[in-house]
């Protein structure tokens, strides 16, 4: 079970990512996926965020951009490719791991890739989606559209 302080930390980080996303014109959408989105995080759960961008490669090398996005000093831990998703993992001073998955807009395109569909079906809450691209993809998968608290 996750304590109240960890939940507040996650909410602060998600709010900071939202504030950053609305200022970056290449960001089309942001969503929380995984255990926090599904409502079943544990103390060892990481915070998984997917950032949908028009130019994902431009976001990758800029560590300052990522630190600004998460709103706290977060040390880089690793980078990994998961097919069309490029993951950057960071760790906060409290030990919370944040996985930022950066993808192109085509990641949400139809037909939806089986890996993408699994990620979205396993838990997805929209943080930022001004064009409705995430909501449209969730609808196409028969997944209920849910927004992170206060991010509608």
PLM region spans:
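Short secondary-structure capping/turn segments at boundaries of alpha-helices and beta-strands
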Residues: 16-19, 33-38, 74-76, 85-88
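Generic detector of well-ordered alpha-helical segments enriched in charged/polar residues
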Residues: 11, 15, 64-67, 142, ...
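Short, basic and Ser/Thr-rich N-terminal targeting/leader segments
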Residues: 26, 43-45, 84
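A generic short-segment signal for beta-strand/edge and adjacent turn/coil regions
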Residues: 1, 15-22, 55-60, 66-71
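Helical scaffold of the NTase/Pol beta-like nucleotidyltransferase catalytic core
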Residues: 1-31
